[in-house]
Amino acid sequence: PAASFAAVATQLLADGARVLVVGDDSDVPAADEIVAGARGAVSWAGVVDLPDLAPLLSLADLVLGNDSGPRHLAAAVGAPTVGVFWVGNAINAAPLGRQRHRVQVSWTTHCPVCGVDATQVGWTAPRCEHDVTFVGDVRVSTVLDDVRAVLASTR
């Protein structure tokens, strides 16, 4: 959730980091929420096109993000990452090493609204209509610990 990313960004800004939020046009509302909650963070969401994103990410000391294209792209261009993954996606797509990449996993397996078992969607269960986060149980403190640990080991 954007509020959690804002909380991490606030702590990193207090540590002296510079925080840049990126994403496509659909990410602008969340980026705006992050920047509003973390004074000093800057949003380029909806501004940086995909061809320009790879070189930008390669310059980052660290990229924090959900299990998303930009987080995977950051890892591909050599940037250290901390990713927030839902358990089903972590099994298939999370990085395995821990020195340059860390993974925070949400173990939520059922929709918090209707209870549909998300591990069976596409197999025995239809997708529910609720647009809710499945990573809300990932704690800000553990993400921040991983961010600081990766930064310390890669600088």
Task: Give the predicted meaning of each segment.
Residues A2-G88:
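Donor-binding and catalytic core of enzymes assembling or modifying cell-surface/extracellular glycoconjugates
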Residues V35, S43-W44, A75-T154:
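Nucleotide-sugar donor-binding patch of glycosyltransferase catalytic domains
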